[in-house]
């Protein structure tokens, strides 16, 4: 057993060849060592294709807790299985979206690095969002943290200052958040009760408040009051929400990304009549994608 736990790839290979019973255990150990980048190259020992293929299939089917990630223009954010928040990327202009303090400004972090200032393990991150110049993190207890460039109020802190470290959005302390989304200059937060808060740039009405005004603090989207929202998504200049199988969109529609059959901007959420039985949606710079309950992409 000690060989399986800490043996070298060569020891593990010899073990698998000595006894067929140990082949699956040896293969698991080799895959884990390779996944942790320890021990160098660790090819699977030779054997019948059937058991190695079965093992690989089982690994692919196994639930994973660490697949929480988001991509901005020049950075990425991750949450591992233990709830640690990690980021990597390049912040040449010093916008703070990596969350490692001003000492990281003007440089690159090429390997995901934990954000120690967030206070893990007291704060465990379960969701992340990122866009060009800011990042959002959601903790297991429903708290929202924002950092990066604060222009237009997209961090929700009531000001436009740059935040070099993750800072809790105090205005949402009375809510239990379950989802976050980051757009070009705006942010969306979904609460446990199905409410949606938006803040940041109001360009083209993408905050959903019926106007084009910026919001420095989170504000509840009143047009969605009474609608049980299940998911939120932010494109660069538009926003999407999913509720009870319906999809709603608002903001800039110049490229048809709102799905309403026109190219107009919509200042408040409007249901997309062409979509039904929708499970989730995502927004890009000038397009939107929805997934229905049959697994079809639209």
Task: Tell me what each language-model feature is.
Residues 1-298:
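Eukaryote-biased RCC1-like beta-propeller repeat architecture
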């Amino acid at each position: 057993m000690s060989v399986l736990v800490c043996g070298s790839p060569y020891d593990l290979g010899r073990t698998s060849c000595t006894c067929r019973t140990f082949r699956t255990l040896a293969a698991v150990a080799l895959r884990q060592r390779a996944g942790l980048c320890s021990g160098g190259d660790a090819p699977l020992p030779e054997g019948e294709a059937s058991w190695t293929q079965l093992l690989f299939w089982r690994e692919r089917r196994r639930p994973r807790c660490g697949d929480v990630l988001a991509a901005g223009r020049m950075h990425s954010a991750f949450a591992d299985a233990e709830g640690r928040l990690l980021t990597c990327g390049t912040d040449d202009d010093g916008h703070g979206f990596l969350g490692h303090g001003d000492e990281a400004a003007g440089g690159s972090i090429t390997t995901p690095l934990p954000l120690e200032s967030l206070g893990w393990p007291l704060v465990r991150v379960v969701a992340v969002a990122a866009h060009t110049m800011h990042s959002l993190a959601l903790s297991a207890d429903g708290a929202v943290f924002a950092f990066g460039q604060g222009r237009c109020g997209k961090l929700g802190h009531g000001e436009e200052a740059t935040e070099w470290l993750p800072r809790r959005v105090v205005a949402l302390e009375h809510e239990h958040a379950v989802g976050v989304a980051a757009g070009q200059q705006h942010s969306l937060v979904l609460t446990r009760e199905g409410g949606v808060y938006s803040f940041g740039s109001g360009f083209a009405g993408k905050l959903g408040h019926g106007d084009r005004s910026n919001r420095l603090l989170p504000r509840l989207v009143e047009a969605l009051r009474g609608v049980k929202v299940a998911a939120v998504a932010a494109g660069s200049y538009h926003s999407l929400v999913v509720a009870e199988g319906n999809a709603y969109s608002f903001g800039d529609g110049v490229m048809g990304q709102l799905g309403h059959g026109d190219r107009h901007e919509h200042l408040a959420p409007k249901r997309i009549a062409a979509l039904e039985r929708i499970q989730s949606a995502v927004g890009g710079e000038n397009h939107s994608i929805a997934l229905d309950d049959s697994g079809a992409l639209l």
